[in-house]
Amino acid sequence: MKVEVTSQALTEVAVDVLILPLTEGTPAPADVNEALGGLCAQVVGADFKGEMGQTTLLYTGGRLPARKVLLLGLGKAEKVTNRSLRRAAGIGARAARKSGARSIAFALPGAVEMDEAAAARFITEGALHGLFRLPDWKSEKKPRPEVEAVHILGGERAREGAEHGRIVAEGVNLARALAWTPGNHLTAAKLAERAAEMCRENGIEVEVYDKKGCEELGLGLLLAVNQGSREEPRFIVMRYKGNGGQGPWLGLVGKGLTFDSGGISIKPTEGMWNMKMDMGGAAAVIGAMQAIARLKVKADVMAVIPSTDNMPDGGSYKPGDVVSGLSGKTVEIRSTDAEGRLILADGLAYAAKQGCRKIITASTLTGACNIALGPIRYALVANDDAWEEEVYRAGEAAGERGWKLPHDEEYYDLIKSSVADMINGTKNRAAGTVAGGLFLMKHVGDTPCVHLDIAAVAWKSGSDEYEDEGATGVGTRTFVEAARRFAEGLR
């Protein structure tokens, strides 16, 4: 989709729909209102209140180059955030598309305390997020109206922001498409192919290890999970050398579980169909690496994705087994449905052994996260307070909300084992998200590491005025912003 920034006046831009973002109590721009013979003033404050997400479509009747004007509510000016502006832009773009628009233009909001670059960035992100259609595999393809061009009305700072927003949105949408793809269409091998294709297109070095390669690396935990599958695992390593490859390296690690049946500890039928999205962390890593490369972030970033599915079979690993992986730590299997932390542990150990200075990992790790936080925020669990705060702030700046969970030493008692170094579950239902995150910390040594548990926010149930049902791409923006800030710290 084409995204352009133009310095044209509101009364000069020739598009199908001109979108005017307005806060509560703010009048429409005087020049547009005058051109429409006072129509905007009649509507604003009457039918249109400016409430968050409210839209009112006006026909210009040839009095403006734009065929229609869409009034878009932002809510109270003091409550507008990067996230709410992004959401409003998505709502506006979808409303314009529903009206048949093929080209749209956004004015920048005037009553909001946000600089031009940031406003253009989050409007662009929101528009491209809202307009994105997830792929389908239907035998009959029905034609659907599509917006082909998005214009932002602003100057050079807006141009910079819109370009940033476009690149990030494309990374998020790539992550959404990957996590939405059915497991039979996206096995570990096919996920590796998609990652390698992205790397080739963006100048990123990539290595893909097959089952034999995983054995040679000593990825015993990944291989244990893979035992019940007919699909071989893959271990994907991507290296973006934005700082010339001299280091220091930031490590991004994503869980690539392409389908999770639960293994022998099999999941209930209800909801199992959706376990194709259990590689949402890996999808976020791939989308982020694309964006990091296209933004030309001046940092060296290593991304690691351990990938397999988790299936029951006569050869599957079993509850009670003791296995070990790259870190050398031994794990007593309490549940084969707690497999994500196993494959991530090998990925994290690899990143740490490769010398990454700091690591962020993301996964749909625990159902307990939904109980703790609901579908609003992801959880952060870490082994280093300072690094956790940096990642938390990066997420906030990128418009992704997290919440820091405790990591007191006593919580490690939850994963103690009498026969191994640790268990892969908990002895009861207490603090499941904390226990899962701290399990991961056991495999990175002293390397500062933050885990994002995105289980409750990686999937949206039901479409609304902003986005379609399906994968959300959460984590992608946090990864990108954290990498950008990591680069700034090197200067």
UniProtKB/Swiss-Prot annotation:
BP terms from Gene Ontology: proteolysis
GO MF term list: manganese ion binding; metalloaminopeptidase activity
Enzyme category, top tier: hydrolase
The keyword Cytoplasm appears for this protein: yes
PROSITE patterns in alphabetical order: CYTOSOL_AP
Catalytic residues, chain numbering: K267, R341
One Gene Ontology cellular component annotation held by this UniProt entry: cytoplasm
Sorted UniProt keywords: Aminopeptidase, Cytoplasm, Hydrolase, Manganese, Metal-binding, Protease
Stated name of the protein: Probable cytosol aminopeptidase
Species assigned in the record: Symbiobacterium thermophilum (strain DSM 24528 / JCM 14929 / IAM 14863 / T)
